Structure formats: C-alpha cells, structure tokens
Amino acid sequence: MALRGSHRLEVIFKRCIASPVLHSQAGNRRSSQLAIKGVDPNSNGNSGQYQQNGEHKEKGWRRLVRFFVPFSLGAAVSAAIIQREDLTPTIAASKMTGRRRDFNFIADVVAGCADSVVYIEIKDTRHFDYFSGQPITASNGSGFIIEQNGLILTNAHVVINKPHTMVQVRLSDGRTFPATIEDVDQTSDLATLRIQVNNLSVMRLGKSSTLRSGEWVVALGSPLALSNTVTAGVISSTQRASQELGLRNRDINYLQTDAAITFGNSGGPLVNLDGEAIGVNSMKVTAGISFAIPIDYVKVFLERAAEKRKKGSAYKTGYPVKRYMGITMLTLTPDILFELKSRSQNMPSNLTHGVLVWKVIVGSPAHSGGLQPGDIVTHINKKEIKNSSDVYDALADNSKTLDIVILRGVKQMHVTITPEDP
C-alpha cells in the first residue's frame, strides 16, 4: 500500500511540473516582477539580471513544492484509507456469508429432522421431588417419531427393567405426554412407545447397507434434558460384530462412529447427510468410540412388531431377568480393553477382563449400593466376571445380596447390592 501511494504521488508531481498552466502562471509572475524593475522580460540582460531571475524562479518552485507535496501526500493517504475501509470489509463479509451458506451442511441436516426427535423420562413413582411433589426422574434417554400417530422408536434399555416407574415423552415444541411401552426386543435392544397425539413430524428411515466408512453422520438426542443436542462425526466401521463388544445373544453388526453418543442421546437417531436415520444411538465406550444399531435391523424389528399388533398382541422378546440391579453394562473384550488403555492412564495395565458399568439408574439398587458409571466389575460373590452373561447368572442366583468387586480407576473397591424383583 505504501509503495502504491508513493508511486501515485510521483506521477501526480511529474504531471504538475509538466503542466502548461503552471508554467504560464510562473512566467506571468516573472514578467510582472521584471517590468516593475524596468527590465525587459524578453531581453537576455546581464549576468546579474539572469542570476536574479534564477533566484526568483528557484523561490517560486520552492513555494510550489512546499505547498503541493504535503497536499498530495495527504490526498494519497486519504484515498488509500477510504479504499481500505470501503472495499475490504465488504469483500470479506461477502466471502464469509457464502461459506456459511455453502458449507454448513450439518446445520441443514439438523434443521430438516430435529422436530422428530423426542426426550424420554422415566419417573420413579415411589420417590417424589420435595419442592414440586412430582415423581423424580430415575432415568432418561432419547427417541424419534416414526409414525405420525405417535409411534416412537428408542432403545430397550432406556425404558425397560425399571420397576415402579412411568414413562413420559417431551416433544421438540415442549409438549409432554405420558407414554406406553408397546414393543420390546431385548436381544436387539429396541423398543417402541406410543403417545396419544397425531400429525407429528416423522423421521425418514434410510439404508444402513449402503453406508461406507468415512461418511459424515449426525447424532441427535436430548442429553441431560437438553433438547436437540447435536454431535457430528464419521462412520469408523460398518461391520463391528456384537461378539467384539461382548454382547450376548445378539447377531448384529454395529455401526461404529466417533460422533459422541451419551446417556441422554441413547435411543436417538444417527442421521446421514440426507436427513435419514441410518442407525439408533446405542452406547459409548470411550471418547471417539460409540456404537449404533443399523437401521436395516430396526426395520426387521418394526415389521415383526407391526404384524403382532395386527393380531392384537405386542411384540416382546428377550431373555428373562429375574431380579433387577439397575445398570447398563458392556463386556470388556480384548479390543475394547486395548482402546481404553491407549486412551486412559487410569486403566490398570494387568486388567484382562471384566464388565464396564456404562449407566446406573438413579434410585436403583446399583445406585443405592454405590456403583458409578465407569466402574469395572471383576468379581461377584467371589466369582470371576468375564462378560455380561456372568452378571446375569449372578442375578439369577438366590443370593440375597451381591458382594461386588470393582475397579474405579486404578483403585479396587467392594460394594454390596441387594437386587429387587421386577
């Protein structure tokens, strides 16, 4: 900018020197001065007169330079400032506005499907809030509307195995409705709810079979009752077998993503960039490792449930749970242990097996006994726990209490839990 300004000043100055108007004005002043002194302006004159004329000429140019240079420099600087203030912000703002419009694809996805995402609360009817007098929230999760007449899809672990509770659903517009559990498949961890309201926004279902690793996805839900919370990431794997996750009785290849799936958005939709649900958010192992149930498996569950409803019965499958402890858990397979140890320094290096407590239901026996999310169960009643099946076997035992050995970070602890009958 400084070079361009000085160049302009030089050009303007040269033009002024060569200007016939300025030459004419300077000549007229010189002729007038010589005429007053009685000197012929057209004569050559003597050397003294010539020297005097030269001095007059030199003084005239000095006046011109003293007047013109500061004026020209100020004009050039002012023009540069005006150009910078008037043009630069306009161009920058125009470019940024275009980027927001062209590249904010995540916001476009959310705007198209957020209205179909709901918040699910499990209320404990035995315990009441001191101030409001309402049942306390024992658990929460998310779901999404799949039919306009109030059918909602979620995870089974969000709504079942919670005795003495009631289910409430809050829509994106703030309205709250009681809900009934219609269909449950504990094997695939899927369930449907029904609320008595019509003309709802419906989530479109896509195809998980066409997904590729590296595709962008968006996880929607309501963690901690914060409606329409959004996390984004990519598909890390489309074929993560349930055996790798230590999930028993499940023949499912899960979707793995680095989009954060938490307690609150569990049961919510995992959406592609077309705004279609391609999975149901299921669980998070650690930062950057979360899993979702592919929507193709969900469609099979929904078809079977619809057939059952036509016959006047509900679709309910899964293994029976004789007693209730109140946790969601995940078997620590060698692959998961490797990932956990590589991401956290609080994992004991000699740990080779166990069950990770992923979620603890408020007010449950596990919560009352002191279990916390992130604890690792290694023994129950002195029996080694290698997978989630061992925990279910311990619950099926007739022991009144469960003496559980856990790892909380690198510290080993004992907790005692008294399971409840469902």
UniProtKB/Swiss-Prot annotation:
It is a single-pass membrane protein. A motif (IAP-binding) lies at residues 75-78, 94-97. GO terms for molecular function: serine-type endopeptidase activity. The keyword Cell membrane does not apply. Residues 139-302 are annotated as: Serine protease. Keywords: Apoptosis, Hydrolase, Membrane, Mitochondrion, Protease, Serine protease, Transit peptide, Transmembrane, Transmembrane helix, Zymogen. The chain crosses the membrane at residues 64-82. Residues 28-55 are annotated as: Disordered. It catalyses: Cleavage of non-polar aliphatic amino-acids at the P1 position, with a preference for Val, Ile and Met. At the P2 and P3 positions, Arg is selected most strongly with a secondary preference for other hydrophilic residues. CDD domains: cpPDZ_HtrA-like. Interacts with th/DIAP1 (via BIR 2 domain). Residues 42-53 have a biased composition (Low complexity). The lineage of its organism: Eukaryota, Metazoa, Ecdysozoa, Arthropoda, Hexapoda. The active site is at residues 157, 189, 266. Residues 325-410 form the PDZ domain. Residues 18-74 form a propeptide. The gene is HtrA2. PANTHER family: SERINE PROTEASE FAMILY S1C HTRA-RELATED, SERINE PROTEASE HTRA2, MITOCHONDRIAL. It is found in: Mitochondrion intermembrane space; Mitochondrion membrane. GO terms for cellular component: cytosol; mitochondrial intermembrane space; mitochondrial membrane; Nebenkern. Serine protease that shows proteolytic activity against a non-specific substrate beta-casein. Promotes or induces cell death either by direct binding to and inhibition of BIRC proteins (also called inhibitor of apoptosis proteins, IAPs), leading to an increase in caspase activity, or by a BIRC inhibition-independent, caspase-independent and serine protease activity-dependent mechanism. Can antagonize antiapoptotic activity of th/Diap1 by directly inducing the degradation of th/Diap1. It is an enzyme of class 3 (hydrolase). This is Serine protease HTRA2, mitochondrial. GO terms for biological process: apoptotic process; ectopic germ cell programmed cell death; mitochondrion organization; positive regulation of apoptotic process; proteolysis; spermatogenesis. InterPro entries: PDZ (IPR001478), PDZ_6 (IPR041489), PDZ_sf (IPR036034), Peptidase_S1_PA (IPR009003), Peptidase_S1C (IPR001940).
